[in-house]
Amino acid sequence: MGRMHAPGKGLSQSALPYRRSVPTWLKLTSDDVKEQIYKLAKKGLTPSQIGVILRDSHGVAQVRFVTGNKILRILKSKGLAPDLPEDLYHLIKKAVAVRKHLERNRK
């Protein structure tokens, strides 16, 4: 975050790990991770939600390092990818919510 009373803009960014190899302590194989992705996608979760669950619950920091593909590519190969891109879906959802709010709270 930037400073209010200084010209600096701050350095808030996420840093990728230096090593792009699978950690030695990770016991899941590529097929195990793919099965988890399929199972979570069938529940209706988005690719970013799947990544958060894999990171927090299963210890998979980067799916791409373990499987060789990103989550969305894995879902597309199985035919489980969402029909709208995730960012576009959330923009549409927000626009609908703003319209609904403006209809209710007209001056």
Curated annotation (Swiss-Prot):
Please outline how this chain is modified post-translation.
Answer: Ubiquitinated at Lys-27 by RNF14 and RNF25 in response to ribosome collisions (ribosome stalling).
Q: Does the keyword Ribonucleoprotein apply?
A: yes
N6-acetyllysine occurs at which residues? 27
For this UniProt record, the keywords arranged alphabetically read as follows: Acetylation, Cytoplasm, Isopeptide bond, Nucleus, Phosphoprotein, Ribonucleoprotein, Ribosomal protein, Ubl conjugation
This protein's gene is called RPS13
Q: Where is this cross-link: Glycyl lysine isopeptide (Lys-Gly) (interchain with G-Cter in ubiquitin)?
A: 27
Identify this protein by name. Answer: Small ribosomal subunit protein uS15
> Where is it localised?
Cytoplasm; Nucleus, Nucleolus
Recorded superkingdom: Eukaryota
